[in-house]
Amino acid sequence: EEREKIGKKPFEYKESGQVVGFDVDLAREIAKELGAELKIEDMSFDGLLPALEGGRIDLAVAGMSVTTEREKNALFSEPYYQATQRVIVPEDSKIFNKSGLIGKKIGVQLGTTGDILASEIAGAKVVQFPAVPNVLQELASDRVDAVILDDAPATQYITAFTGLKILGSPIGNESYAIAMKKSNHALKEKVDQTINRMKEDGRMDALLKKYFGETR
């Protein structure tokens, strides 16, 4: 069974009422290799790891970065995507880099790496939202000073808003991987084998080109 949060282009989002995206296609390939039935349901990002621990889901394929804290509660597959964190501000903002975020009001998606990074900035007031479009809407409405988001969703969603820009320098590098229940080593082995096969036979590159126009 597979559940994903909805609203993180190009990884998972709704189009004509259907859940689509890079992670959805990746989950389909994995299910096909495992001979399993794929079930995709909407789930908030911060609820994914508790759902794994509780046995309500088997895999979390949701643009999730591997962190030391998350590894305490879940097993992670081989990485399938290299991401960075980006700062987005209004075009007329006086914030030019990470140090400019000190003491500012920062919007983030709840439970993400951006949420963690923002909480480490001195004096910052962190405002959490359930999905990327919500975060950018708050910025466009001048209710936060800046937002921190993963690079791919930031690039995809910012086009729907006027007057916003992504600052030039990334503020962190990380790997996306599939999360599984901490004790499920047999499943991890199968998922790793599938990811490695996809990298070797060109299927992973094909997915990257489909959603990003390039390989990574």
Which ranges hold each PLM region?
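Hydrophobic residues within well-ordered alpha-helices
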Residues: 30, 52-53, 101, 139-140, ...
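Flexible hinge/capping segments at coil-to-helix
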Residues: 89-106
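Ligand-binding clefts/hinges and TM-proximal coupling segments of bilobed small-molecule sensing domains
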Residues: 113-130, 162-170, 195-216
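Short helix-initiation/N-cap motifs at beta->coil->alpha
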Residues: 39-50, 93, 110-113, 127-141, ...
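Periplasmic-binding protein-like
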Residues: 81-89, 151, 155-196, 212-216
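Short beta-strand-centered segments that line the small-molecule binding cleft or hinge
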Residues: 48-64, 71-84, 166-167
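Extracytoplasmic small-molecule ligand-binding "clamshell" domains
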Residues: 1-63
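A ligand-binding cleft/hinge motif common to bilobed small-molecule-binding domains
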Residues: 47, 64-72, 117, 140, ...
